[in-house]
Amino acid sequence: MDIMNEKVKKIIEFMDKNSIDAVLIAKNPNVYYISGASPLAGGYILITGESATLYVPELEYEMAKEESNIPVEKFKKMDEFYKALEGIKSLGIESSLPYGFIEELKKKANIKEFKKVDDVIRDMRIIKSEKEIKIIEKACEIADKAVMAAIEEITEGKKEREVAAKVEYLMKMNGAEKPAFDTIIASGYRSALPHGVASDKRIERGDLVVIDLGALYQHYNSDITRTIVVGSPNEKQKEIYEIVLEAQKKAVESAKPGITAKELDSIARNIIAEYGYGEYFNHSLGHGVGLEVHEWPRVSQYDETVLREGMVITIEPGIYIPKIGGVRIEDTILITKNGSKRLTKTERELI
């Protein structure tokens, strides 16, 4: 039985334990994870007690047949798809399924009961296979090259958006399907914006510049952040940079199987707080990375998830002082048998 069918088998076992007649998978990353297909116009996997089938609109049929590891059926109208659900009383669904679609399933397919299946899919996706890790490593390699290119491109007078355009082009030239998210090039006062997507602001001498980017490669993501100074850093910039670097390094060193996401977040957060900047670290320490750039676990002060070998997460502490500037240092890391391994490897010292 191949790996895709092993995933279906685990879902069927979950169905048996929870008295679910069938499971409907509609979220694009989950459709790809289970079937190996990624229909642009969307698709639905219907898993019953004996089989799994991918249903796609007619225009996606030929491509889906080439990609899918499970049988594929096509439909012209949604009513044709609803017929495949006839006789099903209890249906497992993802929490992301739109309310309107659920109402249609009640009306058109006469579904009486809906049960959430997010946990079983999340528990499978949260541990990466060797194949997945190799793909993510390549995505990280592309991101590393892009960060170095950004550092070279950043000069006084250049627009943030110009730098972003260059590095996004480079990522595609190096094999990325596209950026994992809108590239952040945030300079000067904008570096204090954690999600300061590249703008028309011109970079100035003395600016802190936060570079946050990622590459999507063969459906998997990477994520990296580095912060530089244009010209020579002042004492305040050096101070907050060294604090963030200390917190980031300590968290990476502490990441290992058995520690909780909450404990890991606290390690970095406490270091920043001890230096008096706790109020300026206003987001979680990190997040899982895989088919989605933000997925489980949430490496936050509220997440009790126990880290396990094979998880891929980010470690990204920051200090953001409004109207002055900010610093963030982020790596994508792999939880290994005895610790962790940085998958993004660009130098972390202040440039």
Swiss-Prot record:
Its cofactor is Co(2+). SUPFAM superfamilies: Creatinase/aminopeptidase, Creatinase/prolidase N-terminal domain. Its EC number is 3.4.13.9. It catalyses: Xaa-L-Pro dipeptide + H2O = an L-alpha-amino acid + L-proline. Co(2+) 2 binds at residues 212, 223, 330. Binds 2 cobalt ions per subunit. GO terms for molecular function: metal ion binding; metallopeptidase activity; proline dipeptidase activity. Its main location: cytoplasm. Co(2+) 1 binds at residues 223, 287, 316, 330. One of its GO terms (cellular component) is cytoplasm. This is Xaa-Pro dipeptidase. The lineage of its organism: Archaea, Methanobacteriati, Methanobacteriota, Thermococci, Thermococcales.
